[in-house]
Design a protein with these regions (language model features):
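Long beta-strand-rich cores associated with HINT superfamily self-processing modules
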Residues: 526-553
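Periplasmic-binding protein-like
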Residues: 305-350, 397-398, 510-515
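Structural transition elements
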Residues: 208, 322, 335-377, 395-397
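N-terminal lobe/hinge region of extracytoplasmic solute-binding protein
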Residues: 4-10, 27-83, 201-203
Length: 553
């Protein structure tokens, strides 16, 4: 694509402006996974959280490499550690208030962290903090089941005064500032907490609060009158309202964004294949489109807990039978869809090493002879039946292409389309559902929780991060002591070169299990309304940073 305005928002701010007012009109085919900062994991839900909630740290509001930095948000400075990452100290800003006027203090941040431990009540969000802060000899059950005298809470987090936080970790962790940029560090007042019901009306500490929420239909955010711009170094808060329309089909979303009825597709998975072709042929549409490298991996998860995938030969048969070229074309091809992937770590991370454990033949269309040999080794020369889980839109196209390519060797995959909003909480992300519904294969994707190898790979393959209660992303429930040990070794390696080499080993060790079929290192084609201002693709999320956007029309 040669249009000079195409991809303009990938590296710079398009239409910079300080104009305030108006309504930012967003649209999505699916509802948020949760409005509770402890329970959300969808990347676009995190971008909404940036408008509603303050966190201890936050990704910088910048395009390009600068946006990958985490900067102080509620904190006045990055965390300090006197002992190499074992203890972390933060001082919080004064003058920050919840929407009801209550001051935000360290106690409410500590309580927010404690809520993460209540996985029986609040599953769904990231759980790094549990592994770093919990005492295995005396596990903390979360604030709802803390029966100890005086309910002392999580002892590993101290609040010596209202504006000081001290975290005492079980092991050194150099990336702790990144964890403090996740929604799980957004403060929650204990008196406002309603447990599982908090997601219906969380209390805002950021520039916008909920004005109206009709699940599956509409979310309207209005200004938070208690927000003080002078205390917030991250957020622009230009529009008076942010209005999110929910529940259109992916094709309806495309049509109405292209027609100018909405400003962007909040979900951010990119336009459908028909719209890609339309944009490519229309210079006016191309000039307001962006096709960033997202650092996401599009992949097929293969579940060993669902027979016959408990046999590695059946898993390998899927790898060899898959038509990699057709799967890439289902994502939009090499122009808009991304690049063929062989390993797990995307090229933007130092641990990436080109590696193809299961070659797909000279034309990339699959090695059917090797696939049949693997089926024979499993004692299933005629193939078998299974279910492939997916969502609507491009995920469905991928599932259909996968099923067609596997059928060439006798693997009969029935496509099951699951609800998008609950896909990772109660569908593919709930181990019991995977077993009950026999979801042997699943179409999914993953981007790093933060831009390091640990932030990318650990949730997918570290057995200690499996979440039986939902919100699980280690879909294969891989718990290999060697993989876990390599992860720990990589985290404690002394030099960047050592770390990168060890992460490459993790990648290879996981591929030996054949539980992940990498498809595409992702590119996503986004479209923006010409009436929006301050628009850029945030490099940490791969989507437009809605907290920065304004409107001028």
């Amino acid at each position: 694509m040669t249009d000079p305005l195409f991809n303009a928002a990938c590296a710079a701010v398009v239409r910079p402006s300080g104009q305030r007012g108006g309504v930012l009109r967003l649209v999505t085919s699916a509802d948020v996974d949760s409005l509770d900062p402890a329970r959300t994991y969808y990347v676009w839900s995190w971008l909404l959280q940036r408008t509603m909630q303050r966190t201890v740290m936050a990704f910088a509001a910048s395009p390009g490499p600068a946006g990958l930095r985490v900067v102080p948000d509620l904190a006045v400075a990055p965390g300090s550690t006197p002992d190499g990452g074992l203890t972390w100290h933060y001082t919080l800003r004064r003058g920050v208030r919840f929407e009801d006027g209550t001051p935000v203090t360290a106690h409410q941040v500590k309580y927010a962290v404690e809520r993460v431990f209540a996985q029986d009540v609040l599953p769904g969000g990231p759980t790094y903090l549990i592994g770093l802060l919990d005492d295995p000899a005396d596990p903390y059950p979360g604030p709802y089941r803390d029966a100890r005298p005086g309910r002392p809470g999580l002892r590993a987090v101290e609040t010596p005064d209202p504006y000081t936080l001290v975290f005492r970790l079980r092991r050194p962790f150099a990336d702790f500032d990144y964890l403090m940029a996740q929604p799980t560090s957004a403060p929650v007042p204990p008196g406002a907490d309603t447990g599982a019901g908090y997601e219906r009306r969380p209390l805002a500490s950021g520039p916008y609060r909920i004005g109206e929420y009709r699940p599956g239909r509409r979310l309207r955010l209005v200004r938070n009158p208690a927000w003080d711009r002078s205390t917030d170094p991250v957020r622009s808060a230009l529009p008076d309202e942010i209005d999110v329309t929910v529940g259109l089909t992916p094709h309806e979303v495309d049509a109405r964004v292209l027609a100018g009825e909405f400003d962007i597709n909040l979900e951010g998975r990119g336009v459908q294949l028909e719209s890609q072709r339309r944009i490519a042929a229309d210079p006016a549409l191309l000039a307001r489109s962006d096709n960033p490298v997202t650092n996401f991996l599009q992949y097929i998860s293969i579940q060993p807990q669902v027979p016959p995938f408990d046999d590695v030969h059946c898993r390998r048969a899927v790898h060899y039978a898959a038509d990699r070229v057709a799967l890439l074309e289902a994502r939009g091809g090499g122009v808009f869809g991304g690049d063929l992937a062989a390993g797990l770590l995307p090229p933007g991370l130092p641990g990436h090493r080109p590696y193809d454990r299961y070659p797909a033949g000279p034309d990339g269309r699959g090695d059917l002879a090797r696939a049949r040999a693997e089926l024979a080794a499993a004692g299933l020369p005629d193939g078998f039946e299974t279910v492939v889980a997916t969502q609507r839109g491009k995920f469905r196209v991928v599932a259909d292409v996968l099923a067609h390519s596997l059928a060439r060797v006798g693997i009969r995959a029935r496509v099951a389309e699951l609800d998008i909003a609950g896909y990772y909480r109660t569908g593919l992300g709930l181990p019991a559902t995977v077993r009950e519904r026999g979801l042997g294969l699943a179409v999914t994707d993953w981007g790093p929780d933060y831009p390091t190898e640990y932030g990318f790979l650990a949730p997918l393959v570290d057995g200690r991060l499996i979440k039986p209660g939902g919100g699980n992303h280690n879909f294969a429930e891989l718990d290999d002591p060697r993989v876990n040990a390599l992860i720990d070794a990589a985290q404690s390696a002394g030099t960047a070169q050592e770390r990168a080499g060890l992460w490459a080993e993790v990648d290879r060790a996981v591929m030996e299990h054949a539980v992940i079929l990498p498809m595409v290192y992702d590119r996503t084609l986004h479209v923006r309304n010409p009436g929006v201002t301050n628009v850029y693709v945030h490099p940490a999320f791969g989507l437009y940073d809605i907290q920065a956007m304004g409107v001028a029309r």
